[in-house]
Amino acid sequence: LIATPTGLGANIYASVYGKVTEITDDRIIIEAADEQPDEFVPIDVPEDASKLDMVKAAGVVGMGGAGFPTGVKLNINLAETPMGEINPEINPELPKDFSIDCGYILINAAECEPGLEHNTQQIETQTDKVIRGIKYCMEITHAEKTIIAIKKKHHKAIKALQKALEKESAITMHLLPDIYPMGEERAVVRECLGVNLDTTQLPSAARAVVVNVETACRVAEAIDEKRPCISKNLTVRGKLNGGNAAHVYMDVPVGVSVGELIEKAGGIDGKYGEIIMGGAFTGKSTELDAPITKTTGAILVTVEFPDLHGANVGILVCA
């Protein structure tokens, strides 16, 4: 444990054994030890710690990109949470007495940004962990049901879930259309529960909590293994040697440099435009020496920018 929040935030753990050599406004620099044991240092919690306490102690955050502390998000009793006020102007088809019968965990498995594949790969290869994480989220929040929201195109992941859910009556799947931005939180609520929320409303207004699929797995690790949140799944692709195929890396230690992962994926193929950390729509330009964080979803290397002879280019409307 190398940092604790003073306000809204989450614990931060070192992903390597070593010595802190420098602290800046946005980084803690660690000189890694020559020998790196495979095992991690378990989170320090009392024997009678609740599952929510374990999630908080582990520093789990929303792994889909937003990074909101999961221990705060799950700190709700959905069984006792009333429906929020539904705006009839954006819900003209709903009856005045519309209600949602129980609390829901909505698992965001849309992996909405184009080109990303690490969420679907985790579903395919770690289905049991996904289900365990879902059940823990349900238990903590007193949710009676879960809906896994996943795009129709992810056939292999859907098949893996169908098999895993054969005996799980409280967990179902909802197939999303293959369009952007289906992974936006309120879009998931709308698609799964049929309610349009105002932009100022949280999913709790629909008696729901939205959890990214990787986040659910980190919840399972915190509870089952007392594992701190020290790694990230991500996709690397773009203008790389060997082509534009997706390179999926699971459990990458937080703090590894962008450049190191690009080299692992084959290295940059000649000249390029920029390196984007995050998705193609919502990511930000970054540098080779930048570290990945708990919220890094992808590293994309773009082609060279065309010469527009000084013309201004921008997105007028996005989503």
PLM features: what roles do these ranges have?
Residues 1, 13-22:
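Generic structural motif
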Residues 1-9, 27-30:
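Short hydrophobic beta/alpha edge segments that flank linear recognition/processing sites
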Residues 19, 23, 82-89, 174, ...:
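Residues forming the flavin
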Residues 29-107, 114-117:
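Hydrophobic alpha-helical hairpins/lids featuring a short glycine-rich hinge
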Residues 90, 232, 269, 273-319:
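Ferredoxin-type iron-sulfur electron-transfer modules and their immediate structural context
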Residues 115-125:
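Glycine-rich phosphate-binding "P-loop"
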Residues 124-140:
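Histidine-anchored nucleotide/phosphate-binding helix
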Residues 144-258, 264-271, 279:
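Hydrophobic alpha-helical positions that pack around
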